[in-house]
Regions:
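Sec-dependent N-terminal signal peptides
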Residues: 6-12
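Sec-type signal peptide cleavage vicinity
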Residues: 2-6, 17-302
């Protein structure tokens, strides 16, 4: 005996509407709400390392995620703290949030901003870059770094966010010149810096290794003719005055090779590029003379 299946008209209409809705979801890339949390792979920091003789502690300044435990992540108008899980080589990281994460609502790209460090009192605002005045200790040098990824498109199938440094990196290599057989024990200080956002006008550098010194600064321009590098060696104080404006841009590294002479500082070369070394320029500083104090010490301006 045959049985016939009768479907009421209203039920048939519901089936038809459901089919249309599924087709529309597939067509506009929408996803079910609350099922696809936003998890991002963080990359982009340069893998340029500190010199081999330096301590092995790693940080973002070395292109390393080991010292970063969380970042502020902005999507739309909301900002949330995301946990950082570094890769085994610490050169990339996974950004995720266990409770109340962002969710993908479609397969379309999303716009994300993220930064570290952030202000716990107000995580919604990216803090201004403010570096330490005394960076002679490794921890203070490393903690002066600021990183961010601003208004970046993140793809659903490849959710990657590229970070960059918000600071400029200055590296100074000293060499003994006329009147010196060694430059060991020198103190190197960057001077004539901008005080914007409460930044120091002078920064004591970190002795990274041997005769190499480093410091991180906020982006700024040091005017031509102003003292920029101060070297204290023995009883003498020496200055290097650039002949052109020094434009310190975020994410760039500026490497100066400076020869210390009894009559002043000679610039042997200046390399300007990304956080790792790049192309640049070279030249010499003028000898502007020196003065002798009553105690027998002398200051050379060059």
């Amino acid at each position: 005996m045959r049985h016939r299946l009768f479907i009421p008209a209203a039920t048939a209409l519901l089936f038809a509407l459901a089919a249309c809705t599924q087709d529309e979801l597939a067509g506009d890339n929408r996803l079910p709400e609350g099922e696809y949390p936003v998890v991002i792979r963080a990359t982009g920091l340069s893998v340029e390392a500190t010199p081999l003789a330096a301590p092995s502690t790693r940080a973002s300044v070395d292109g390393d995620w080991q010292g970063v435990t969380s970042v502020a992540l902005k999507m739309g108008d909301a900002v949330k703290e995301y946990t950082v899980t570094a890769s085994t080589d610490f050169k990339s990281a996974t950004l995720s949030r266990e409770n109340d994460p962002y969710y993908w609502t479609s397969r379309d790209p999303i716009t994300i901003s993220a930064w570290w460090p952030f202000n716990n009192a107000d995580i919604t605002q990216m803090p201004a870059v403010k570096v330490a005045e005394d960076q002679s200790k490794l921890a203070d040098f490393q903690n002066s770094d600021f990183i961010s990824a601003e208004n970046r498109k993140v793809e659903f199938n490849n959710p990657t966010l590229e970070f960059t440094h918000r600071t400029a990196r200055v590296t100074i290599e000293l060499k003994p010149g006329t009147g010196f057989t060694s430059v060991a024990g020198a103190t190197v200080i960057l001077v004539s810096l901008s005080a914007d956002n409460g930044n120091p006008t002078a920064i004591k550098t970190y002795n990274a290794s041997g005769n190499t010194y480093e410091a991180l600064t906020a982006p700024q321009t040091v005017a031509a003719g102003k003292p920029f590098i101060r070297v204290e060696l023995g009883s003498g104080t020496f200055y290097f005055r650039p002949q052109n404006n020094v434009v310190l841009e975020a994410g760039n590294r500026y490497k100066y090779t400076v020869k210390v002479n009894a009559t002043g500082l000679t610039l042997e070369g200046c390399t300007i590029g990304d956080w790792a070394d790049g192309g640049g320029e070279s030249g010499e500083a003028e000898d502007l003379g020196y003065s002798i104090q009553n105690d027998g010490s002398y200051t050379v301006y060059n």
